[in-house]
Amino acid sequence: MDLGLSGKIALVTGGSKGIGKAVARGLAQEGARAAICARGQDALREAAQEIEKATGHEVFPVSGDLTKPEDAQRVVDAVIAHFGHIDILVNNAGAAPGGEILHLTEEDWEKALQLKFMGFVRCTKAVLPHMLRRRAGRIVNIIGNDGVKPLGIEVSPSAANAADLAMTVALAEQYGRHGICINAINPGPVATERWDELIGGIARMRKISVAEAQKRAEHSIPLGRICTPEEVADVAVFVASDRASFMNGAIITLDGGQRKALLD
């Protein structure tokens, strides 16, 4: 199936590793030219070189700290200066601190909201004027299923993700009229560095081994395993493509059936 992505310009935040890197690679494999954004310059350059070598398509690395409003605008401006425009924005950067509310500090909450929520807001605000002028665009927000099914041990990510989901649906209604489709993907557990940190924290909190915590996590998923970054990327690439041209305001759950939804 031709996804119609050849020649499209995509900006992927959090693109130096994990899900973001897999999404950028997936887009490049379909012929898109990708810009990737992250804070760490070395990891960013390495990721860009790796994707270029694997796909034969240009990847433009641009460093930025999306907790800073001026950085989000600068990143978008740099991508437009380099490629001419942006067709696709994939908001992926940021992970909120986990833990129960009594263990979270004000700083933890600030981190959760500044990167996981306000980072999405800032990048979206920066690209929207350009997409409005072209009357076309795709915004894919990679969020997390605890925004719909909150967890006590993940209270700050749950809150930030819920805010991202609300923004997705609200903006889809507002900007769909202008040819801009805005959708969300809610992954469950995904095998990334972030998951390794999270499962380690769960193991310590429950006073069990990491192997046992991993086993229990896998058992909670009907498919019996953790999702891969590439599986999230496959969905994101499709949602960003012309083949999903009537998808707008959708929230796609990608958790292997882990969380019940129908009346619970």
Q: Can you say where each PLM-predicted feature lies in the sequence?
A:
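Active-site loop-to-helix junction immediately N-terminal to the catalytic Tyr of the SDR YXXXK motif
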Residues: 104, 150-159, 170, 198
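Short, small/polar-rich loop/turn modules that mediate ligand/substrate recognition or access, typified
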Residues: 176, 181, 247-249
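Alpha-helical segment proximal to the catalytic Tyr-Lys
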Residues: 129, 173-174
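Conserved glycine-rich cofactor-binding loop
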Residues: 9, 16-18
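Active-site helix of classical SDR
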Residues: 124, 160-161, 168
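Substrate-binding pocket helix/loop in short-chain dehydrogenase/reductase
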Residues: 100-101, 108-113, 139, 217
